[in-house]
Amino acid sequence: MRCYFSIWPYMKLSEYLQQAKEGHYAIGHFNFSTEDVLKAVVGAAKESGAPCVMVGTSEGESGYIGIPEAVALVRAVAKDMDYPVFLNADHFKTFDKCKEAIDAGYDSVIIDTSRLPMADNIAAAKQVVEYARSVNPDISIEGELGYLKGASEVEKKIEISPADYSKPEEVAEFVRQTGVDRMAVVFGNIHGIVTDQEEKLDIPHFEKIVVAAPAPAYVLHGASGLSDDDVRNSIKAGIVNVHFNTELRVAYHDEIKKQFEEKPGETTPYKYLAPAAEEVKKLVAHKLEVLK
């Protein structure tokens, strides 16, 4: 694992996740596509007393920033703030994209081929694990099993069925064959935020998954639309890493919109972006309190 800070008492991501598992708390993961949001996330994490933070770029976000640029930016912010920050390639969907992130210096990769038949999903995850291990055995690899519906946006309603959930016996087989470090599973969670229905996790189902396959670090994706209590209950049941994205985007968007409404003639970017980043920072601080 690449160390971004010269004097920080460094630990591997796997060690932070293991400590979270043993301590029954979770490490936060927050996506970014701009420097100000990255700084807001890291600043909030450091001020909250969280042991570390994960930041992620989706394929779209990394396409906007640039994969090597994202690595350089995270490295600079982590060093400047003297705080452990781990950069994750979030839901990369092909081996080639995962390889590009690994070669550029990402600390972690999610190979998301959950849309494929299980055998193909296993083969893809195994290929990424084997390549990552050959480059640096400390790079953390996450697989995904189950149908995680939605996108990182606000929608009215998304139909959720137990048939979409990750099946405990399949998760156990996936972990056994691939050797992934982390697992993203589906038990009522969705990507994005819905306005006309209540999102609710099926905690008993998740507990069955943990019993069937206790080894990996379990990851909750799509936490933006969930209640704080649902997130807390998932952590009690074994979640050690929680992803937020849509809520950050909404907070950023809404504050920029507010700034333009209040000051329609303002054209200096930092004068309307800085308040938006501050709103993101407040939101991240709240989420990190929930994860403790």
Where does each model-flagged region fall?
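N-terminal amphipathic alpha-helix/helix-capping segment at the start of soluble metabolic enzymes
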Residues: W8-G28
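Hydrophobic faces of well-ordered beta-strands that scaffold small-molecule active sites
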Residues: A26-N31, V53-G56, V85-D90, V109-I111, ...
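C-terminal alpha-helical cap/extension of soluble enzyme domains
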Residues: L226-K292
